[in-house]
Amino acid sequence: MQTRQLLALALAVAATEAAHQGFNYGNTKSDGSAKSQSDFAAEFSTAKNLVGTSGFTSARLYTMIQGGTSATPISAIPAAIAEDTSLLLGIWASGGNVANEIAALKAAIAQYGADFGKHVVGISVGSEDLYRNSVDGVKSKAGLGANPDDLVSYIHQVREAIAGTSLSGAPIGHVDTWTAWVNGSNSAVIDACDWLGFDGYPYFQNTMPNSISDAKALFDESVAKTQAVAKGKEVWITETGWPVSGKTENLAVANTANAKAYWDQVGCPLFGNTNTWWYILQDADPVTPNPSFGIVGSTLSTTPLFDLSCSAVSSSSAVPSATAAATAASGAGASGSQTSGFATAAAGSSSAAKPTFSVGKGPNGSYNGTYPGSWNSTRPGANGGSSGSSGSSGSSGSSGSSGSSGSGASGHSSSTGSSSFPSSTNLLSNSASGLSGSLFGAVAAVFVALAAL
């Protein structure tokens, strides 16, 4: 009887431990017009029923604020509740609007209560604010950023806002580029977070070999470097993708064949194993941007522009191993050398044209430095160096002024597979290879319990 109960428990725990998979959703369309609740509902329904997939049932938001308003809660919330879509909430942390963001968060909690709480998988305080605040971000005119100390303060404010509410158990993190994460002067943000969000686009790494055949290696390397400084905290993949159309970036060609290859090589190993929010379901309504990353075209449809099935794709190497993360740490300036600016960014790199569309900007048109938003390919997140480069730290800690030079990245390896049984997580962390939100930890824990009978 004990065995049956434990197996039942395994299934129950596995169900709760399944990694979230979804897309990023801005509060406006590509022409800057605000999305309505029905717009969000249609997108969420489409994502759940995409042909060739098991369904993308999670949504990452950039802001808590409805487009065109100052502090009204975003209408994606009631749409998500109606469509049973989980939410990675976003607090826009640049430009001095945090008070309104938190006000909208509190209003949403009061309005939607327990239904809201059970759909929230996490809260991201900020999106690439550290990159935008770096020397390279300022050079690229990526928009307003935020200092590490400010982000830490905002994280604490959000914790206070959700204490004792239906969202009290929501893990809080921050989303940024890997070069921001490995910059030692930003380590206080890592300390304040429950998880780290990773944004990366090999397509834009145009100062190095970045053909589609290079893409997975570039992606894995940058994730490993992020894991190496994460201090054992989970690294969630909050943005990545490959464009279906648009200009060529060095060796990176935007077309559906390459978008499919990137989906197979990078996406499929992640889906179901690591919390992942892909960029993007649709970005061509009503205007098609250059480049365009949408997996559906200008008309919302459950039939994608390319085959999304992963059945024939290996699920191995969902995230880089702990060994790879440790190696990345040693090659990313872990010795503690200090430099001014990102030493891993290619000197004199050429900049690409900035996209003109607005999907994914902050509330009411403020820039999001990650693609989408104000983009320049000289950004360190696009042009970081390969393994073995020295001195990954030292971006400015203030908006392009006299900011401090940070120390090199510390060589922490990350063990991110979580489960309801901490002892099994520790025992099996090497085998799990750091799979964030994986079924592995839950099932393995039950087998450990069975072995002890």
Curated annotation (Swiss-Prot):
GO biological process: cell wall organization; polysaccharide catabolic process
PTM remark: The GPI-anchor is attached to the protein in the endoplasmic reticulum and serves to target the protein to the cell surface. There, the glucosamine-inositol phospholipid moiety is cleaved off and the GPI-modified mannoprotein is covalently attached via its lipidless GPI glycan remnant to the 1,6-beta-glucan of the outer cell wall layer.
Residue ranges of the propeptide: 431-453
Record key words, sorted: Carbohydrate metabolism, Cell membrane, Cell wall, Cell wall biogenesis/degradation, Glycoprotein, GPI-anchor, Hydrolase, Lipoprotein, Membrane, Polysaccharide degradation, Secreted, Signal
Lipid attachment residues per UniProt (GPI-anchor amidated asparagine): N430
Catalytic residues in the record: E128, E239
A Pfam family hit: Glyco_hydro_17
Glycosylated residues (UniProt): N183, N364, N368, N376
GO cellular component: cell surface; extracellular region; fungal-type cell wall; plasma membrane; side of membrane
Provenance organism: Aspergillus clavatus (strain ATCC 1007 / CBS 513.65 / DSM 816 / NCTC 3887 / NRRL 1 / QM 1276 / 107)
Mode of membrane association: Lipid-anchor; GPI-anchor
Catalysed reactions, semicolon-separated: Hydrolysis of (1->3)-beta-D-glucosidic linkages in (1->3)-beta-D-glucans
Signal sequence extent: 1-18
Disordered as annotated region, ranges: 370-423
Localization (cell): Cell membrane; Secreted, Cell wall
Record function comment: Glucanases play a role in cell expansion during growth, in cell-cell fusion during mating, and in spore release during sporulation. This enzyme may be involved in beta-glucan degradation and also function biosynthetically as a transglycosylase.
GO molecular-function terms, A-Z: glucan endo-1,3-beta-D-glucosidase activity
Family note: Belongs to the glycosyl hydrolase 17 family.
Biased composition (Polar residues): 370-380
InterPro entries reported for this sequence: Beta-glucan_modifiers, Glyco_hydro_17, Glycoside_hydrolase_SF
Enzyme Commission numbers on file: 3.2.1.39
Descriptive protein name: Probable glucan endo-1,3-beta-glucosidase eglC
Enzyme class (EC, first level): hydrolase
